Amino acid sequence: MPSGMFSIDNILAARPRCKESLLLPQNGPLLFSSLGESLYGPADYSGFYNRTVAPTSALQGVNGSRLGYNNYYYGQLHLQTPVGPSCCGAVQALGTQQCSCVPSATAYDGAGSVLIPPVPHQMLPYMNVGTLSRTELQLLNQLHCRRKRRHRTIFTDEQLEALENLFQETKYPDVGTREQLARRVHLREEKVEVWFKNRRAKWRRQKRSSSEESENAQKWNKSSKNSAEKRDEQAKSDLDSDS
């Protein structure tokens, strides 16, 4: 291959991936968070977690494993070679030290063990943990660590006008009314429901603020009236004393 050309593997290998927080030493235990009703399955991790689960109190151990600190479950995951983030190289023996590229939230519990973030409970029913490769585990870890961003709906002027008009008619439209409006303005019924919930909260805040302003105005008027009466009485008293 000419010196000026690079393969895809060379390009990808040149990029440091120091944000990888998954360290899997050889024969080291894999730690899963206590997920209540989510983490429960066959005793050897070799089957799929697809059955009805027991309460959290019944989950005292899996495959003879113990419950670690912060409600993390320990389970054995066997790898052929010690691995770690590409920026750290091979990990031989993990003790209490921590790699500089791993976030401080990642902690270790003795030599040969590693703590990774909890696995999303939606994925557990479809996982066969014992057969996952290093790449798959890293991908799973990255998907879990990715921040969830809230999608904010941007309403058009026509949609806002239709929503406001219905809000003036009723503050609590039923499902049928919401669905009818949603079809008319090309929105999902769930979006209409959320909009009305937020609009009612705004309406209550405005109503409370208006009520407080009215009370303050009444207090001010009453105070002004009392002050005027006191001034009149004082002026009358001064006139009487002069006479």
UniProtKB/Swiss-Prot annotation:
Compositionally biased intervals (Basic and acidic residues): 227-243
Annotated Gene3D superfamilies: Homeodomain-like
UniProt keyword list: Developmental protein, DNA-binding, Homeobox, Nucleus
Location of the region described as Disordered in the Swiss-Prot/TrEMBL record: 201-243
Database matches in InterPro entries: Goosecoid-like_HB (IPR051440), HD (IPR001356), Homeobox_CS (IPR017970), Homeodomain-like_sf (IPR009057)
Subcellular location: Nucleus
Entry keyword annotation includes Signal: no
Up-regulation conditions: Induced by activin (even in the absence of protein synthesis), lithium chloride, nodal/nr-1, nodal2/nr-2 and derriere. Not affected by basic fibroblast growth factor, and repressed by retinoic acid, and by UV light.
Family per similarity comment: Belongs to the paired homeobox family. Bicoid subfamily.
Protein name according to UniProt: Homeobox protein goosecoid isoform B
Gene designation: gsc-b
